[in-house]
Amino acid sequence: DKEIENRFYTDLSFGTAGMRGVRGVGRNRINNYNIRKATQGLANYILATTGEEGAKRGVTIAYDCRIGSTEYALNTALVLAGNGIKAYLFESLRSTPELSFATRELKAQAGVMVTASHNPQEYNGYKVYWEDGAQIVEPQASGVVNAVNSVDIFTDIKMITEEEAKAKGLLEYIGKAVDDRFIEEVEKQAINRDLPNKKDFKIVYSPLHGTGRVAVQRVLKEMGYESVYTVPEQEMPDGMFPTCSYANPEDKSVFKLSTELADKIGANICLANDPDADRTGIAIKDDNGDWYYPNGNQLGICLLYTSPSPRDA
């Protein structure tokens, strides 16, 4: 049977960008067993390279809206705890940028984000970050990959219960305090906080069923943008992504509901995030009143153009 062969013919690859695959039973699928294997490898690498200090500093863990993400994140925390490594687990879904921030803010040794970014709904994944809040690069990348690939999934996993991890002080749930610090730092990055008429400037926003709603709505409101309209059909987290089979804000098809709402209320700009909110796309109306969808390169140029020059900084 080809389906059985595909599930078991090889191990799910863990590379420098972590691992990503279809959820399901099998060696070649994302499931609790492969999540535990990846985490055991990460734990082995942390203990081998940073020792007791790294164990005390711990690992931050966040997860997105995808099916299985909550369970995979808890499994990650309990394997780390089983190895004597402190786990800081977000109490509910958070974005990848906030995971990066939390890793630095809590001075953790590493971070783990359970997500498959903008892949179709049947996927999930696991990304590893280092103490600087960035995805692992050399020499950590090769070290973690080799450590993960050396783990025997049946005999090497060290894991304890949630109750035991809490009792030992090896599992700490995090949330509002980190959120507040994250939002504070995000708001400091504003280039111009005193734009005229921003209170009445209409913006349509969509998190595409993902994590963006946790921070984006709050940031815009606190920055004085009071006329923000979130697409109701896409506001709540939903790992099935019922309104968009491919939740990538670089794909203009995901803006269909956003532009319809914008036309209805008279807005000229729409913003959207992918499920883990580390990617943003926009739609804007051109001089003819038609919707235009700048690509990432064009957005980068606009950001560079509006940023202070080194002489102004």
Where are these regions (language model features)?
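Well-ordered alpha-helical segments embedded in enzymatic catalytic cores
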Residues: 34-41, 98, 181-185, 254-257, ...
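A glycine- and small-aliphatic-rich helix-loop capping segment at beta-alpha/alpha-beta transitions
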Residues: 75-82, 106-107, 127-135, 218-226, ...
